[in-house]
Amino acid sequence: MISGLSHITLIVKDLNKTTTFLEEIFDAEEIYSSGDDTFSLSKEKFFLIAGLWICIMEGESLQERTYNHIAFQIQAEEMDEYIERIKSLGMEIKPERSRVKGEGRSVYFYDYDNHLFELHAGTLEERLKRYHK
């Protein structure tokens, strides 16, 4: 029986650069670094973001960008602050997609390795309520 999400692993070209990205944007807490050791496929680091285990492993960046993404929930009043954090690291912010009123505001942005992230100020319940109108 599935009991929850265990972790998310992202392959990144530069562990240190991605560490800064995760810490500055998501307030990630680094909890492990393999250093020069390799216990898995390559050097790796583990982080906690709002209790979620995020693993980054050294490897080649994604060659293509897609809409596959990881979305983190934030409060609506924090959106502008997060957008400034994203801009301060020179991340590419995608234009906002069209939304229906009540769906919650989002910002989408790519990291250095073409992973797409979303910060969303809304909940599943709010979205379902709006879609069922």
Swiss-Prot record:
Q: Where is the signal peptide?
A: none
Q: Which GO terms describe its molecular function?
A: metal ion binding
Q: Which CDD domains would you find in this protein's record? A: FosX
Q: What's the encoding gene here? A: fosX
Q: Where does Mn(2+) bind?
A: 7, 69, 118
Entries under PANTHER family matching the protein: FOSFOMYCIN RESISTANCE PROTEIN FOSX (PTHR36113:SF6), LYASE, PUTATIVE-RELATED-RELATED (PTHR36113)
Is Lyase one of the keywords?
no
Keyword terms: Antibiotic resistance, Cytoplasm, Manganese, Metal-binding
Designated name of the protein: Fosfomycin resistance protein FosX
Q: What is its main location?
A: cytoplasm
Q: Which cofactor does it need?
A: Mn(2+)
Q: Which domain of life does the protein's organism represent?
A: Bacteria
Instruction: Answer yes or no on keyword NADP.
Output: no
Residues in VOC domain copies: 4-122
